[in-house]
Amino acid sequence: MKGTVLGVAGIGLIGGSIALRARANGATVIGFDRDPGALNAATAAGALDATAPDLTALAERCTILAIALPVDATLAALASTPALNLPELVFDVASVKAPVVHAARTIERFVASHPLAGRERGGFGAADAALFEGRTWAVAPARDRAAQARLERLIGELGARPLVVAADEHDRLVAVSSHL
């Protein structure tokens, strides 16, 4: 990942784990979070090289942008942040895909995804560079196949296995499995 400038919006369990693993793999990582405590903890832990004051500033500084915000904040960001067309790749990690794909329809190099990994606790304090090791990471087919291929390579570098699945099918499977 050397030479990659990864922006991570949302420095909780998933975003923090992405940041930790990417830094360990040699990427430069810039973070944004509305909680200064999360940014301070991530910086102190060596997960971040720098921070950004907002999502627009983050998108302007990175080559790859991971949106690791809650679903409602992800949808709002996708619909209202024109700078998301600047990075070479933008991806999300929300647990629902169809609404995200719809909200991101104007973002050229966007790929919807969902790592099937987590913990009972959230927040940066629960983040772990090995969280995705051996786990499946769902990837919705993207209009930009080069962006999709790039995300699939990144997922492998984060330790996970990409699985391409249509957004609607992903949502149906997650809904069924959440009741088990």
Locate each region found by the language model.
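Short beta->alpha hinge that forms the Motif I/post-I loop of the SAM-binding pocket
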Residues: R34, L69, V93-S95
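Phosphate-coordination loops involved in phosphoryl transfer and adenosine-cofactor binding
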Residues: K2-V5, P87, G134
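NAD(P)+-binding Rossmann beta1-loop-alpha1 motif at the extreme N-terminus of oxidoreductases
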Residues: M1-A59
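Rossmann-like NAD(P)(H) cofactor-binding subdomain of soluble oxidoreductases
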Residues: A76-A126
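Hydrophobic Val/Ile/Leu positions in short beta-strands of Rossmann-like dinucleotide-binding domains
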Residues: G7-V8, I67, V139
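Residues at the starts of beta-strands that form the adenosine-phosphate
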Residues: V5, T28, R109, T136, ...
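Rossmann-like NAD(P)-binding element
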Residues: L55-L89
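Internal alpha-helical scaffold of NAD(P)-dependent oxidoreductase catalytic cores
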Residues: A129-L180
